[in-house]
């Protein structure tokens, strides 16, 4: 991705050049002149198409506001396509932009070798470019991609590229990855039962080739010679559902790897349950590219999905007030709708004109209402669930929990106004232990403004019982026990960072073993969550996606859009259990898990497996070796032949003799069907759920919003505001989100208020605004609150509540204990995702933490201080204070600081709580982190972690002057 050009190593070339007579175009370069070969990379919205008139690939880019305009679509070389035997690269290109007089900053051909070649100034006429490979790199065999693009000076750019040719001697050198050359004309390499299993090879493999078909365990099923020396089409006999692999052999070519494919039931023949528990987060509007919406939606359909999760952007859909442009968002939803798949959709941005003083959460309540109303009206019958925001309790929102609650109220009212039948979900909370932020949300009267309580979790299976216990207690506390519980994101972290090289250089990929781990984990997690009382779970994510600098590989599809084994596992789970009702658990034997389901026809199905790392570990699980974990067990059923399927849907038969059906459990889930008469050992009781009340005994349409002055400072966790002076100013907005005028009086508690008006009038879909001053009332620990309520047209309103903290009053009323022990490196335990050093810095009089992270990966450093009990007990602690600084603030990337109280003494073990604090600068700064804000008792804290999430490279930070503040 090229945003600035001054740092590039640029080599100027002439646009003409003669190809030496002894060189010839390599046959594989013909494959490069297709739009499918280019991956969109730009600072705008890029559409890639084939221009038949020009016989060229066309790139059309619209840029958003700003001046950083660039477009460098990536042409990734596949297996068998190597610059090792290329002497020169030749292509033609031309370009036009919205303002032709504006000109171009530059045009470049870039390579992952780090070199960029300056191209002739773009013109609206064809120019031929020739590049010598020796000017690009000294190791051409290691170049994995090139990009042809430019930096225009106006907001619309269209350019074409054609006749890409690689000239060389044509000698084969690099091994060929089978997955890169075996093709099939089906989306995602996913065949339905009734489709012909037909494959072809890229044209440049023109020599005798042997194919070998295996199952997922590597057992050979068939073999033969590829038709016409690799130039023909290979048709395999019909195969049952399952996950399969094609391998290639040749005496003339070194093939590596395999080409996997999946066989699934015909979607038109599947039973469908619109309320199915099992779902997937597709994210296709962002990850598929508009040209891929239909293909991605068809892959979802073939998995049996009835609902998927997707995204929207308010800023893109309504850049100007009242001017809507649904564009790709509508096209994406339509791609699902025409396949009978409904959508759960979310957005978590706001145009600047709607923020009304907020940093990220919209503060214009009428604007939120109108946009939500237009969404639910426009997408009626296509989008079944609307979520407002995403992970607002962490970095996706920068404003207070009270700001989120106000906007959530407005969104709910708008959604219901546009379509009363739509379901509204609260924004997915990332902190499943429900930190204080989530409590402040509900204390702002949010309970009647959503139908679905929505969470996200990325953890091992063993974490979920505690999660659900806490969630149920939370819901009971706030009177929402009857609401649906849905996890709109759950994903696997047990396999760790990708261990294989990816299709794109900086993106790592799962190894085959890691892919199988995710396949094993997925149904186990889903069934356990269902048994714990979750109402629906969306697995993250269908389409290929990388995070953590490219190290973490997500997606049930690979970067080439082929299905991983996890996709096949999900498809079969959906086919077996998507319409079934969970009855409970079975006791099948030691180390065997069994879940009992009842099918619509009254028969029963048992899902079973043997315990493995996937069941007990939160990360770094190891795939069972073939043959490990196999345990025989019996089920008491009447005599007969019963059918079942393995994890990927491949059928098997089992015979019951003498009233016993003997089966073999492995670490992979299997299903046995057609049973009857079985009783669960632990019965599952489905919760009776209801949505938000249609009517309430107060006025739901009055919504309060506050603009705090700089007399306040919002805490890093966004759950309270500290007050800097005795009398503090703020602006109160009263929004009327109804078509009726409202007259009433305000009620503000929590201190002495100056400027409170008498009776006020709020017009329909309007607001009343007033500036106020408050002298807050604080308790003995320095805690207070602002609470706004009122009575309008004779009805009470939903409240606004802002927790307050006076650090000055808290410190005066508390007892401060210095902790010089934290200066001793020996008292800290190393805990980081890379090698770290802990030392005492005499100059700074501080403990120093130094960690060298790789260029990519999950970079975190959280050294652990274990308290010596009872002398270091935190019983009665109000908070922890310390000074911190970093050697250098990272220029980019995810950067945050957390303080983690932990209820255990072991390294990386025990329940922990993630308390955010402001990320440090390169200067000494003081931090205070409350330890009494809910969720845990400070007396139970056994260790504390104080550290950072870092983008990459060297991380160095210091801590000093640690203090624990206790109540007197």
Can you annotate each of these PLM segments?
Residues 46-69, 837-860:
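Short carbohydrate-recognition loop motifs
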Residues 63-139, 155-160, 165-170, 856-936, ...:
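Extracellular ligand-binding interfaces
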Residues 168, 320-323, 328, 354-473, ...:
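Active-site cleft segment of glycoside hydrolase catalytic domains centered on the general acid/base Glu
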Residues 264-374, 387, 393:
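N-terminal substrate-binding region of glycoside hydrolase catalytic domains
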Residues 587-640, 729, 735, 740-742:
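Carbohydrate-binding surface patches
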């Amino acid at each position: 991705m090229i945003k600035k050009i001054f740092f590039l190593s640029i080599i100027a070339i002439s646009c003409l050049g003669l190809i030496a007579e002894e060189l010839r175009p390599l046959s594989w370069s013909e494959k490069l002149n297709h739009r499918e070969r280019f991956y969109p990379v730009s600072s705008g919205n890029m559409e890639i198409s084939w221009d038949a008139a020009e016989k060229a690939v066309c790139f059309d880019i619209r840029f958003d506001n700003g001046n950083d305009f660039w477009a460098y679509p990536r042409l990734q070389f596949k297996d068998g396509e190597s610059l090792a035997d290329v002497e020169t690269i030749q292509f033609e290109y031309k370009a036009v932009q919205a303002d032709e007089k504006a000109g171009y900053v530059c045009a470049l051909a870039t390579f992952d070798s780090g070199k960029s070649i300056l191209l002739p100034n773009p013109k609206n006429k064809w120019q031929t470019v020739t590049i010598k490979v020796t000017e690009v790199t000294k190791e051409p065999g290691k170049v994995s991609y090139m990009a042809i693009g430019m930096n225009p000076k106006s907001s619309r750019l269209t350019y074409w590229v054609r006749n890409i040719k690689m000239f060389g001697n044509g000698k084969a050198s690099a091994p060929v990855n089978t997955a890169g050359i075996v093709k099939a004309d089906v989306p995602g390499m996913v065949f339905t039962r009734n489709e012909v299993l037909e494959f072809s090879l890229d044209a440049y493999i023109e020599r005798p080739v042997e194919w070998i078909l295996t199952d997922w365990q590597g057992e050979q099923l068939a073999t033969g010679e590829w038709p016409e020396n690799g130039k023909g089409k290979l048709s395999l006999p019909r195969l049952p559902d399952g996950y399969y692999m094609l391998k290639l052999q040749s005496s003339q070519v070194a093939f590596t790897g395999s080409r996997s494919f999946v066989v699934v039931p015909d979607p038109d023949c599947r039973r469908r349950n619109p309320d199915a528990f099992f779902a997937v987060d597709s994210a296709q509007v962002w990850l598929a590219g508009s040209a891929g919406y239909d293909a991605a939606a068809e892959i979802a359909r073939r998995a049996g999905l009835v609902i998927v999760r997707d995204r929207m952007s308010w800023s893109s859909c309504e850049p100007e007030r009242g001017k809507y442009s649904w564009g790709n968002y509508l096209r994406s939803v339509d791609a699902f709708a025409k396949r009978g798949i409904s959508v759960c959709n979310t957005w978590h941005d706001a145009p600047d004109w709607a923020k009304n003083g907020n940093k990220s959460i919209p503060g214009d309540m009428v604007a939120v209402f109108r946009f939500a109303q237009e969404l639910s009206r426009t997408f009626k019958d296509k989008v079944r669930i609307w979520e407002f925001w995403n992970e607002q309790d962490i970095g996706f929102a920068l404003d207070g929990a009270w700001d989120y609650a106000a906007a959530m109220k407005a969104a709910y009212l708008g959604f219901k106004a546009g379509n009363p039948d739509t379901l509204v979900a609260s924004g997915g909370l990332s902190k499943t232990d429900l930190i204080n932020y989530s409590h402040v949300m509900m204390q702002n009267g949010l309970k009647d403004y959503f139908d679905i309580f929505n969470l996200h979790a990325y953890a091992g299976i063993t974490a979920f019982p505690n999660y659900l216990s806490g969630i149920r207690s939370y819901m009971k506390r706030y009177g929402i026990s009857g609401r649906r519980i849905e996890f709109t994101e759950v994903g696997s972290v047990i396999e760790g960072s990708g261990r294989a090289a990816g299709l794109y250089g900086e993106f790592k990929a799962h190894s085959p073993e890691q892919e199988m781990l995710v396949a094993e984990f997925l149904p186990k997690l889903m069934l356990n969550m269902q048994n714990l009382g979750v109402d629906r779970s969306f697995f993250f994510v269908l389409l290929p996606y990388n995070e953590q600098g490219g190290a973490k590989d997500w997606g049930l599809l690979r970067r080439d859009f082929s299905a991983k084994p996890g996709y096949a596992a999900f498809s079969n789970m959906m086919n077996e259990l998507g319409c079934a009702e969970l009855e409970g658990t079975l006791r099948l034997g030691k180390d065997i898990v069994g879940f009992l389901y009842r099918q619509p026809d009254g028969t029963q199905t048992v899902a079973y497996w043997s315990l493995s790392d996937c069941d007990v570990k939160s990360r770094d699980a190891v795939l069972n070796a073939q043959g490990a974990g196999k345990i025989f067990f019996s089920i008491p059923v009447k005599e007969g032949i019963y059918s079942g399927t393995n994890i990927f849907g491949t059928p098997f038969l089992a015979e019951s003799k003498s009233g016993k059906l003997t089966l073999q459990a492995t670490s992979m889930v299997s299903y046995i069907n057609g049973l009857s008469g079985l009783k669960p050992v632990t019965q599952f009781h489905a919760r009776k759920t209801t949505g938000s009340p249609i009517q309430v005994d107060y006025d739901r349409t009055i919504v309060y919003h506050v603009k705090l002055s700089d007399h306040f400072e919002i805490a890093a966790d966004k759950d309270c505001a500290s007050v800097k002076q005795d009398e503090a100013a703020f602006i109160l907005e009263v929004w009327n989100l109804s078509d009726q005028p409202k007259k009433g009086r305000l009620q503000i508690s929590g201190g002495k208020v100056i400027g409170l008006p008498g009776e006020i009038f709020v017009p329909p879909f309007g607001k009343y605004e007033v500036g106020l001053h408050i002298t807050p009332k604080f308790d003995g620990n320095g805690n207070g609150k602002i609470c706004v309520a009122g009575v309008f047209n004779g009805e009470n309103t939903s409240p606004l509540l802002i927790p307050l903290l006076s650090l000055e009053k808290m410190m005066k009323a508390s007892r401060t204990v210095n902790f010089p022990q934290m200066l001793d490196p020996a008292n800290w335990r190393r805990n980081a995702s890379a090698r770290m050093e802990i030392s005492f810095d005499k100059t700074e009089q501080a403990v120093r933490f130094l960690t060298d992270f790789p260029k990519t990966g999950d970079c975190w450093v959280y050294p652990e201080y274990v308290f010596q009990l009872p002398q270091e007990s935190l019983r009665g602690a109000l908070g922890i204070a310390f000074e911190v600084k970093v050697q250098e603030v990272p220029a980019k990337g995810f950067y945050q600081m957390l303080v983690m109280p932990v209820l255990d003494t072991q390294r990386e073990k025990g329940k922990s709580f993630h308390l955010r604090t402001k990320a440090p600068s390169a200067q000494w700064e003081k931090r205070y982190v409350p330890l009494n804000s809910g969720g845990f008792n400070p007396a139970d804290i056994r260790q504390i972690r104080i550290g950072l999430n870092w983008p990459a490279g060297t991380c160095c930070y210091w801590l000093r002057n640690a203090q624990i503040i206790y109540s007197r």
